[in-house]
């Protein structure tokens, strides 16, 4: 579309959600359903940021690609800042397999700390 001065109208801004969960943590949709829901909502880019796991990322990426949705690999880490728990988002993750292995150790340490508190 052009305006009266002959210039093209700007392209529509992409629709993006950079913080969402699947059943790999506390979400209600499987990674495949997450991708399908994003497409139905008209989102162009979504980040799957499950709590302390990247287990659903590969499934979401594979399901989203044919739907025209880009999945940004991510994770939401629960970390301690003194006595306060803070949620830290990691986005555009590379080396998912190495991160997944590190998160297993991370999750085990968190479980051990929780058991020690009880």
Describe the residue ranges of each PLM region.
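Extended, charge-rich helix/loop segments that form flexible
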Residues: 115-118
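Active-site gating loops and adjacent loop-to-helix segments of metal-dependent hydrolytic enzymes
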Residues: 80-105
């Amino acid at each position: 579309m052009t305006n009266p001065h002959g210039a093209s109208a700007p392209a529509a801004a992409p629709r993006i959600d950079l913080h969402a969960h699947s059943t790999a943590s506390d979400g209600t949709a499987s990674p495949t359903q997450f991708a399908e829901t994003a497409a139905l909502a008209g989102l162009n880019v979504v980040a799957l940021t499950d709590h302390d796991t990247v287990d659903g990322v590969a499934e979401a990426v594979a399901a989203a690609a044919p739907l025209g949705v880009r999945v940004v690999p991510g994770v939401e880490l629960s970390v301690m800042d003194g006595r306060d728990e803070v949620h830290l988002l990691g986005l555009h993750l590379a080396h998912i397999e190495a991160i997944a292995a590190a998160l297993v150790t991370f999750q085990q340490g968190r479980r051990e700390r929780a058991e020690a508190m009880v």
